[in-house]
C-alpha cells in the first residue's frame, strides 16, 4: 500500500485525513449554481444549498 511507504505515524494520519476530506468534497457545489439543490433532490427529495465545499440538504 502507498500509505505503508510513509514512515511517520503522525504524517501518515495527516495524509489520511487530507485524502478523506478531499474524497468527501463536492466540487460542483461552489462551481455550479443549483448543484446542491439538484443533488439533494436526487438523493433525498429535499432542497439543498452549498455550505463551503459540501451540500447541505434541508431537514424535515
From Swiss-Prot:
GO terms for molecular function: potassium channel regulator activity; toxin activity. InterPro entries: Long_scorpion_toxin_alpha/beta. Pfam families: Scorpion_toxin_alpha-beta. Disulfide bonds join 29-50, 36-55, 40-57. One of its GO terms (cellular component) is extracellular region. Expressed by the venom gland. The primary structure of this cryptide Pep-3 is identical to that of cryptide Pep-3 from other Tityus species (AC P0DRE8, AC P69940, AC Q5G8A6). Negative results: does not inhibit Kv1.4/KCNA4, Kv1.5/KCNA5, Kv1.6/KCNA6, Shaker IR and Kv11.1/KCNH2 potassium channels. Does not show cytolytic activity. This is Potassium channel toxin Tst-beta-KTx.
Amino acid at each position: 500500500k502507498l500509505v505503508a511507504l510513509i514512515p511517520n505515524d503522525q504524517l501518515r494520519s495527516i495524509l489520511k485525513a487530507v485524502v478523506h476530506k478531499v474524497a468527501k468534497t463536492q466540487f460542483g457545489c461552489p462551481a455550479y449554481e443549483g448543484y446542491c439543490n439538484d443533488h439533494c433532490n436526487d438523493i433525498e427529495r429535499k432542497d439543498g444549498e452549498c455550505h463551503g465545499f459540501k451540500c447541505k440538504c434541508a431537514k424535515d
